[in-house]
A protein has these predicted regions:
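N-terminal hydrophobic or amphipathic helices and topogenic motifs
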Residues: 1-99
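Generic hydrophobic, helix-prone segments enriched in Leu/Val/Ile
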Residues: 44, 138-143, 212, 224
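Phenylalanine-focused residue identity feature
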Residues: 44, 114, 153, 188, ...
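A short, structured surface patch at a secondary-structure boundary
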Residues: 54-162, 168-175
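Extracytoplasmic substrate-binding proteins
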Residues: 146, 159, 163-224
């Protein structure tokens, strides 16, 4: 299943790119610069490369997201990129072009972090109905029609996700109870990120996941 994930991730990464050089051209290998220093969180890593590239890793499954700056290309060696601090086998690679948008947010506890980061506009679909949200900003976005209900984790509305050009689904580990949904999403070229904030032992480790999403959304300064 890993291979399909990888190719799906690559396809999804090509969405929304406007680089005139075509999708086959690749950039030179990346040069590692530094890593985000974390105080409490143990389940993710963020590594920075020269030229504005970033590699986000979720440690429990080894999955990686390569963020490619606007108008840049993914490097030739993208598949081989591994966080210097990662242990174990690398998982799938998802390539996303910045700015990251059209997300399908199923892990509802993360919505608060997007609100803190002032990045609600990166999410266009979610896994809760308007009446089930306890976060006023999410309720309001659904009222305004800027946030659409795209089905719960076990029954996503694939048609809606595709029509909204969904770039990635952000799930919690519940998705592992329905592996067929994960496979179907990948088949449609929609990669899945499983967030593990609830697996952090230290309560402040959970809170620190805002920095993971800050890196994803290019809002590091708001996350600190």
């Amino acid at each position: 299943a890993n291979d399909t994930g990888m190719s799906a991730g690559k396809n999804a990464g090509a969405k929304g790119t406007s680089a005139a050089t075509g999708s086959n051209s690749t950039a030179d290998p990346l040069v590692y610069d530094h890593s985000m220093e974390l105080s409490y969180a143990e389940n993710f890593a963020v590594d920075y490369y020269e030229g504005g590239y970033k590699l986000l890793t979720t440690r429990l499954n080894g999955d990686r997201i390569l963020l490619v700056p606007k108008h840049q290309q993914a490097p030739k060696d993208a598949e081989a990129l591994v966080s210097p601090s990662a242990e174990g086998e690398p998982g799938k690679l998802i390539v996303l072009q910045e700015p990251v948008k059209n997300l399908y947010l199923v892990a509802s506890s993360v919505m608060d972090m997007f609100v803190q980061l002032d990045s609600m506009d990166a999410i266009s679909m979610c896994g809760l109905k308007e009446e089930d949200w306890y976060i006023p900003a999410a309720k309001q976005a659904m009222k305004d029609g800027t946030l659409l209900y795209a089905g719960k984790y076990s029954q996503p509305d694939y048609e809606l996700l595709l029509s909204q050009n969904c770039s990635m689904a952000i799930e919690n580990s519940m998705i592992y109870h329905t592996p067929e949904v994960m496979e179907k999403l990948e088949e449609f070229g929609i990669p899945t990120l499983v967030e593990y904030s609830s697996y952090e032992e230290h309560p402040l480790g959970r809170v620190e996941w805002v920095r993971f999403f800050g890196a994803l959304l290019d809002q590091e300064e708001k996350a600190d």
